[in-house]
Structure formats: C-alpha cells, structure tokens
A protein has these predicted regions:
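Generic detection of long, well-ordered alpha-helical segments
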Residues: 33, 131, 213, 217-220
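Alpha-helical structural motif
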Residues: 2, 6, 69, 174, ...
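Catalytic subdomain that performs nucleotidyl-dependent activation
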Residues: 56, 126, 134-214
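A short, amphipathic alpha-helical segment
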Residues: 11, 15, 44, 210-213, ...
Length: 235
C-alpha cells in the first residue's frame, strides 16, 4: 500500500468519527509490531497537512519478555520527529512467577494501565491504538462465539475514570494493507518474544474468518459494513 492511500484511509476514519481536534496531544501505543508502526507512520505524517493541529508521542510498555530490541523503533521515531519513551516493567516475569491462569487478559490490563499513566504524565489527552479493520470483524465474531453477545470495540471511546479518549485511526485499513505497507516501507518490526503469541482466541477467529472467505469472498467486508449500518457500539 502506498503512503498516500494510508493517509487517505486514516483521514477518512479520523473525519468520520471526529477522532482528532485542534490542540490534541496523542499517545501512540507502540508494541513494535506492524500495526502500531503503521499507525505511527500515518499519524506522524498527517501532522504536516491535517487541518486540525495536533501532536503525537510514542510509548512502548516493555513487559520484560526476553530481550526485545526497540533501537530501530527509536530511530524511526527520530526520523519522524516523534518523541519516544520506553516504559520498563516486570509484568511478564511476575505473571509467570505467579502462574496466572488467565495471563493474557491480566497482562493486557497491566500494560494498558502503565501506558495510560505514561500518557497522562506526558500531557496527552488522547491515546491511539492500532486496531485495524480485520480486528473489528474478529472481535465481533469472538464476542458472539465466546460471550453470546453482539459487540465489537468502538472507533472512539472515553476511558472511564481518566481524562483520556481512545481513538483507533486504522479501522478502515485491512490487515493485508498494513502488511503490504510494512514491506514497502521496510518498517522495523520487532519480533514478539511472548511464548503465547499466535496461540490466542483472536488467532483462532482469524483462521475461522479466513476459511469463511474461501467460501464467501468479501465476507469480512460485508460483516464490517453490517456493523456500520446497524451502528453497533458507536459505529
């Protein structure tokens, strides 16, 4: 995917759901994966021409899984003129030591807490997650199969008990487009060393949708359109 196409799709989502206002300071959550680096590239570049003036910072919460090297991410941030902060934690070793049964949800909760705290400390009023179009559909499927309810995450959410709004500017971008952009612009993806990476319920949902598309081409796009048409969870 070309950079201009990325800008176009992100701007469409930002405008449709009024994600950015004048004076916003947005903290971008950087895991080092393809999605978060693509979001970083988009929001950093759009500062040059988007009519509403805003600023961004990048934050990585290092959970203490192995020896993950974010030096190339730091170089990318410097090239994009984006301040970058790494928050060191011992989240993963502590969870392993306690032998937590539901480690993934608890890890996510602790990471989000550390990220939100850093965002507020840096003077941010918004945070940005790199959930893309496929994530919306996968969450929709998982909610029905695992929870028995019709639900997915919203493009914009106010975080209760905080002064932060959460925005998801990549919701019009497919995972395939993110993957293509990452290759085309050689983004410095950091390998995820978490031992349960790729063995989650979301990966199962991803495979289910892939099989569905073999039988029903464009199934994901049509599910996404249904979510929007029925205004499910703020869409």
């Amino acid at each position: 995917m070309e950079l201009q196409k990325l800008y176009s799709k992100v701007r469409q989502a930002v405008d449709a759901y009024q994600m950015i206002e004048d004076g916003d300071k947005i903290a971008i959550g950087i895991s080092g994966g393809k999605d978060s680096l693509t979001l970083l590239y988009a929001l950093a570049g759009m500062r040059k021409f988007y009519p509403k003036k805003y600023d961004v910072v990048a934050i990585t919460v290092d959970t203490g899984v192995g020896n993950m090297d974010f030096s190339k991410v730091k170089e990318l941030c410097e090239s994009l003129n984006v301040p970058y902060e790494i928050i060191p934690t011992q989240i993963f070793p502590i969870l392993m030591e306690r032998q937590e049964k539901r480690m993934c949800p608890l890890c996510a909760k602790l990471r989000k807490g550390a990220f939100n705290e850093a965002a507020l400390r840096l003077g941010c009023n918004k945070i940005a997650y790199a959930h893309h179009k496929d994530d919306v559909v996968e969450t929709f499927l998982m909610s029905q199969v695992l929870e028995g309810r019709v639900h997915t995450f919203s493009p914009v959410t106010h975080l209760d008990g905080t002064e932060l709004d959460l925005i998801r500017p990549l919701v019009y971008v497919t995972e395939a487009e993110v993957r293509g952009f990452t290759r085309r612009y050689q983004l410095p993806v950091v390998k995820n060393l978490c031992p349960v990476d790729g063995a989650t319920k979301r990966e199962t949902a991803k495979r289910m949708l892939a099989r569905m598309e073999e039988e029903f081409p464009k199934a994901k796009s049509r599910i996404f359109a249904a979510i929007q048409r029925d205004h499910i969870d703020g869409w």
